[in-house]
Amino acid sequence: MSISFSNVDFINSTIQSYLNRKLKSYGDPKYAYLIMNKKKPTDVVIISNYPTEWVDIYRNNNYQHIDPVILTAINKISPFSWDDDLVISSKLKFSRIFNLSKDYDIVNGYTFVLHDPGNNLAALSFMIEEHRSEELEEIIQNNKDKLQMLLISAHEKLTSLYREMSRNRNNSKSQEADLFSQRENEILHWASMGKTYQEIALILGITTSTVKFHIGNVVKKLGVLNAKHAIRLGVEMNLIKPVGPAKARS
């Protein structure tokens, strides 16, 4: 199934929260996770904790077309470091973006690369700030395998969320298994209607602990932080099927 990535705010924020959480143990580095369709490079998604102004300028000017880091990543499989010399060594004459990046102290970095089955380039770049260069370089060098796996897991989560959104938007009538079990869907439905766990338990004739158990499974399936995020994602992506009226059981 071909997936078309777009800038869906909630999905992007979900992935950014995931990356922020995972990167805390690596010193909270500045990062940019970029996904670009190699057949249609104008289709790009950027999830980053770089300065917002820099990300907006990059996206609005389609700088992925002239970014030496991205142009190098297209032809790479293994991770690589970069700085001003990349423009010279790669014989790319696109120094304009590096001149802009200097204004935001984005001069040196390290990029991890992934090419997915949908012909997309996924690149996770870390900015190595000058005042922390030795510390961050050592962290990256000692954890390259873990950071590469982080890119893979983040991209898998992103792909899964967009795939599910695409299925629901197209009202697919295939017989593939539902994302949620019947009970999980019922609980999500009532939670999205503003019911408390105790009220849901009464409506469905189950215990509050059972409600919490199923909500925990939903949170895991969606790869989000908590029940509130799961309910919001379920509503925004139309993942929750309507259920019939239920009477409280005594």
From Swiss-Prot:
Gene3D superfamilies: Transcription factor LuxR-like, autoinducer-binding domain, Winged helix-like DNA-binding domain superfamily/Winged helix DNA-binding domain
GO terms (BP aspect): quorum sensing; regulation of DNA-templated transcription
Keywords tagged on the record: Activator, DNA-binding, Quorum sensing, Transcription, Transcription regulation, Virulence
SMART domains associated with the record: HTH_LUXR
DNA-binding region: 197-216
Coiled coil: none
GO terms, molecular function: DNA binding
SUPFAM superfamilies attached to this UniProt entry: C-terminal effector domain of the bipartite response regulators, Pheromone-binding domain of LuxR-like quorum-sensing transcription factors
Domain HTH luxR-type: start-end pairs: 173-238
Record bears the keyword Protein biosynthesis: no
Superkingdom field: Bacteria
Recorded family membership: Belongs to the autoinducer-regulated transcriptional regulatory protein family.
PANTHER family: DNA-BINDING TRANSCRIPTIONAL ACTIVATOR DEVR_DOSR
Role description: Functions as an OHLL responsive transcriptional regulator that acts in virulence (soft rot disease) through the activation of genes for plant tissue macerating enzymes.
The protein, known as: Transcriptional activator protein ExpR
Recorded name of the encoding gene: expR
